[in-house]
């Protein structure tokens, strides 16, 4: 493993592994619609012994589409640099052959919009501009976008450009696309070592802030005074982004942030993954409970991918 004492490596490992742990911890209670149902399973937002965190024939530590697609994007960046055609092909390989999946056999949890795009769009028809298809506002682009924020973290214009183009591979919707920009910008701030209390003011001053959809601007402007009871737990990108940011800003350590995100119920694996990725980038690998890491399926492969992302990011920056 890369030396976790190296601050940048520690943060990148934290982001990738935190994402995967948040995913598998949320998996057993995905689609429970009420927070009290999550509490019934986990117990007051604690995490039960990991051996019981299973769902059907999926064992503890089994991650879903959130992490598998994130790993596909990461490996594409490692293999080809930024290449949306290769990203598309790796997503197809996951969807139909189980590439990067937890059991290395088949995909799990693929969204209908993503499946439709992989079946019908074709690698030669990937859009490069937002056309705002209202049917493509799900969180499938947000859940996988983390590696962009890692690789390009020092170049904010590249974070924006690459986040947009990578999201458009499957999601041609302004909120779905710009949610990835917000998330990856905060990942960038985390890897740069900024204090999270300064994130929002820094973001409001970014030149691209004016381009954001109004719904995202409203979310960010109200973030620090948001009533948790008003937050929706649907699988749409805006709601998932809000849950992740509220959970991140309202807590002081990674495990509490992930538990809070899962505690909102709904699309819990994605909420846990997105929150875990950001919190991991901020607090680092050493902040993840050891038993969470030890239970993660394909742990060595995931850590190796994170190491390779660290190597690429270090060279770029």
Which functions belong to the PLM regions below?
Residues 1-317:
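Structured, active/binding-site neighborhoods that engage oxygen-rich ligands
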């Amino acid at each position: 493993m890369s030396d976790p004492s190296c601050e940048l490596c520690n943060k990148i490992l934290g982001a990738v592994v935190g994402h995967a742990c948040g995913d598998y911890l949320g998996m057993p209670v995905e689609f429970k619609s009420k927070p009290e149902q999550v509490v019934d399973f986990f117990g007051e937002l604690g995490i039960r012994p990991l051996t019981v965190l299973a769902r059907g024939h999926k064992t503890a530590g089994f991650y879903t589409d959130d992490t598998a697609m994130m790993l596909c994007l990461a490996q594409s960046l490692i293999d080809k640099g930024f290449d949306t055609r290769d990203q598309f092909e790796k997503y197809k390989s996951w969807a139909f052959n189980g590439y990067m999946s937890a059991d290395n056999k088949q995909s799990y949890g693929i969204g209908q919009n993503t499946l439709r795009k992989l079946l019908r769009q074709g690698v030669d028809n990937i859009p490069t501009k937002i056309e705002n298809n209202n049917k493509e506002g799900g969180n499938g682009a947000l859940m996988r976008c983390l590696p962009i924020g890692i690789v390009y973290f020092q170049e904010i214009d590249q974070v924006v450009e690459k986040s947009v183009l990578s999201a458009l591979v499957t999601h041609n919707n302004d909120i779905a696309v710009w949610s990835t920009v917000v998330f990856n910008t905060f990942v960038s701030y985390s890897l740069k070592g900024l204090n999270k209390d300064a994130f929002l003011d820094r973001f409001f001053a970014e030149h691209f802030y004016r381009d954001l959809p109004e719904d995202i601007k409203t979310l960010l402007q109200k973030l620090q005074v948001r009533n948790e009871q008003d937050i929706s737990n649907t699988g749409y990108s805006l709601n998932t982004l809000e849950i992740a940011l509220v959970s991140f800003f309202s807590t002081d350590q990674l495990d509490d942030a992930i538990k809070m995100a899962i505690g909102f119920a709904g699309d819990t694996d994605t909420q846990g993954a997105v929150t875990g990725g950001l919190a991991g980038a901020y607090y680092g690998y050493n902040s993840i409970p050891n038993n969470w890491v030890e239970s993660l399926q394909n742990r060595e492969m995931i850590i190796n991918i994170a190491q390779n992302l660290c190597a690429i990011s270090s060279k770029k920056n």
